[in-house]
Regions:
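Phosphate/NTP-binding elements of NTP-utilizing enzymes
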Residues: 1-177
């Protein structure tokens, strides 16, 4: 079997092997929907973004066909080199990249079986977040990457008031150094 065929073969992945041990407890807390807000601090290389973007977000989408995800950074032009590849990394690690369609401009990831979306926005243009229209479902997950770069709780609260409507439950992640 050549290397191309080997890559195309389905492989079983143990999700626990992909999660840094420091996030085991958080993983199960999120699974059980025990909280709405998860603020995860850690230095570079702490695996917080890998956990949220690479693993938790795709799993949550596959578990609940009604939710969509919005990923936010303070500056929009940083998305293509940060959070988007982080999520793609997770899809590759879990062996499920073929179930998702990746669009670079504007950045967007679609779960092919249901049409659910991961939408990316920079808050350097906050009006874009207010005009989100989804074909079905609701925004069930919001991820603020580099949370410490946002202006403060008022900015975050304004965004959440625009996004968190019409669903039975939500999860908000904030990752920062």
């Amino acid at each position: 079997m050549n290397s191309h065929e080997n890559r195309k073969r389905k492989r079983k992945v143990n999700i626990a092997d992909l999660i840094a041990p420091s996030f085991d407890e958080v993983f199960f807390d999120v699974e059980a929907h025990r909280h709405t807000f998860y603020m995860l601090a850690g230095g570079r290389g702490s695996a917080k973004s890998s956990f949220v973007g690479g693993i938790r977000i795709p799993l949550s989408m596959m578990e609940d066909p009604d939710i969509h995800v919005v990923v936010l950074r303070k500056v929009g032009n940083t998305i293509k080199n940060s959070v988007l590849p982080q999520i793609v990394w997770g899809l590759e690690q879990m062996g499920i990249l073929d179930r998702f369609r990746i669009k670079m401009s504007p950045p967007e990831i679609t779960y092919k079986p249901t049409g659910q979306k991961i939408l990316f926005f920079g808050l350097d243009d906050p009006a874009k977040v207010k005009s989100i229209k989804l074909p079905f479902g609701y925004v069930g997950i919001v991820w603020f990457e580099e949370l410490d770069q946002f202006s403060g709780m008022e900015e975050i609260r304004n965004v959440l008031q625009s996004l968190l409507r019409g669903g039975p439950s939500y999860q908000v992640f904030g990752t920062y150094n």
